[in-house]
UniProtKB/Swiss-Prot annotation:
UniProt domain DOG1: residue ranges: 241-455
UniProt name for this protein: Transcription factor TGAL4
Keyword rRNA-binding: no
Lineage: Eukaryota, Viridiplantae, Streptophyta, Embryophyta, Tracheophyta
Key words, A-Z: DNA-binding, Nucleus, Plant defense, Transcription, Transcription regulation
Subcellular location: Nucleus
Organism: Oryza sativa subsp. japonica (Rice)
Length: 484
């Protein structure tokens, strides 16, 4: 009976077992049941267990490799290597496709008379399936975490760059700054930038002033060595006068160069176009001299009118701080031959108009001298001891002295206009010869001054003896009027 019951109960269990093993099989499929009986349930579950263990071992090796890689890179500051990144982000090896895509429990509930072995097999396969699913889910979670770390690294770097470059974040607190603070920071940066620019400009100005001062010292030393600067009595030379002396010494050097160019151009028979360029440059050079004298007249008019900037021989021919235009024309006319009739008439008219202007300026200067002398002589402290009255007369005298500046400037304008008129009347080559004659005339006067200053000592002693004899001869005449 037991055997019969077991044999009779066995066909009832086959549909359930086949239902768990094969999804598409029918419960009453006899060929499938016979095949399962021939192979044996033990062999089937043994192969299933072996495949699951291989899969679990593969998952454990993958997990250990990922853990080792993450530990190494957490201890190092260098970024992950390309191999580790590829291994971490790679997909897990494919699993055996031996499980159904739907839940393992069959929709058909087992009957009450099922075999205990079938239930045990069902529980074992379910537990192994759950462990396989848990291992797969753990592997996916681990790979997802590592991929997230790899994704977070460039995102963190990008956020750092944005925080560094963005003006709305503070480098210390990491909080957004309000517009008022941002505006104040921008103003501070702009003020610092302007301060640096001002400091740089100030340093450059100091350097240029230092170089200019050194150049001025060299020019003054050179001018004094040439006997051009004798200085005012007592050393009361103003800064404007000293500046003009330096500029005039430099102008003389440049004038010598232009005279050499004119001399070379005339002897080389340059074309009129090339020679005209040299003549025009020389005329501009004289205009620059008159501009310098105008600034010096405003700074210290007495320095110009007394001729302290010129040599002693030049002072003998000085008129209101310069040469007389009419006298210069008389000196130049014989050296400009041959002249056309029209040129002679033009030069004569220019000379006549220059003389008239000179006389007018001389009369005005004489009147100024007379009025100035009367102002200074009036209001003597002996007659009027009032200090206020005396200071009033001094104020009037100062106002009259300011007119002296105007006379010197008008005289320079007359000299400048005379040179320009001569440039218009003469041809290019005649104008070149004219400028050469003017330069040579003043060079000879300066040479005469140098010779006078460097004359031998015996001549100086003889001059002193002559002066002594004159003074002795003058004493008897003075003694004749001693009674008076």
């Amino acid at each position: 009976m037991g055997e019969a019951s077991s044999s009779s109960g066995h066909p009832r269990q086959n549909p359930h077992v086949l239902g768990y093993g094969f999804h598409g099989a029918m419960p009453n499929s006899l060929p499938s049941a016979n095949l399962f009986e021939q192979q044996g349930g033990a062999n089937y579950f043994g192969e299933l267990e072996e495949a699951l263990m291989q899969q679990v071992a593969t998952l454990r090796r993958t997990q250990q490799t990922a853990t080792t890689t993450s530990t190494l890179h957490h201890g190092d500051t260098t970024p992950f290597s390309t191999t580790a990144t590829a291994a971490a982000t790679a997909r897990p090896p494919p699993t055996l496709d031996i499980f159904p895509s739907w839940p393992m429990r069959s929709l058909h509930t087992p009957k009450e008379g099922s075999n205990v072995t079938a239930d045990t097999t069902d529980s074992e396969s379910s537990s192994k399936n759950n462990s396989n699913q848990n291992a797969s889910s753990d592997q996916h979670v681990l790979v997802g975490d590592m991929a997230g770390q790899f994704d977070q690294i460039p995102q963190q770097e990008q956020h750092k760059k944005m925080a560094t470059n963005s003006p709305t974040h503070s480098s210390k607190t990491g909080k957004a700054l309000d517009p008022k603070t941002m505006r104040r920071l921008a103003q501070n940066r702009e003020a610092a930038r302007k301060s640096r620019l001002r400091k740089k400009a100030y340093i450059q100005q100091l350097e240029s002033s230092k170089l200019k001062l050194a150049q001025m010292e060299q020019d003054i030393h050179r001018a004094r060595s040439q006997g051009l600067l004798l200085g005012a009595p007592g050393g009361n030379t103003s800064s404007g006068a000293a500046m003009f002396d330096v500029d005039y010494a430099r102008w003389l050097e440049e004038d010598s160069q232009r005279m050499a160019e004119l001399h070379g151009g005339l002897h080389a028979h340059l074309p009129d176009s090339d020679l005209r360029a040299i003549v025009d440059d020389t005329l501009t050079h004289y205009d620059h001299l008159f501009n310098l004298k105008g600034m010096a007249a405003k700074a210290d008019v007495f320095h110009l009118i007394t001729g302290m900037w010129a040599t002693p021989a030049e002072r003998c021919f000085l008129w209101m701080g310069g040469f007389r235009p009419s006298e210069l024309l008389k000196t130049l006319t014989p050296q400009l031959d041959p002249l056309t009739e029209q040129q002679v008439v033009g030069i004569c008219n220019l000379q006549q108009s220059s003389q008239q202007a000179e006389e007018a300026l001389s009369q005005g200067l004489d009147q100024l001298h007379q009025s100035l002398a009367e102002t200074v002589a009036g209001g003597s402290p002996l007659d009027d001891p009032n200090v206020g009255s005396f200071m009033g007369h001094m104020a009037i005298a100062l106002g009259q002295l300011s007119n002296l500046e105007g006379f010197v400037i008008q005289a320079d304008n007359l000299r400048q206009q005379t040179i320009h008129q001569m440039h218009r009347i003469l041809t290019v080559r005649q104008a070149a010869r004219c400028f050469l004659a003017i330069g040579e005339y003043h060079n000879r006067l300066r040479a005469l001054s140098s010779l006078w200053a460097s004359r031998p000592r015996e001549i100086l002693v003889a001059d002193e003896g002559n002066c002594g004899e004159l003074s002795i001869a003058a004493h008897p005449s003075e003694s004749q009027y001693s009674a008076f």
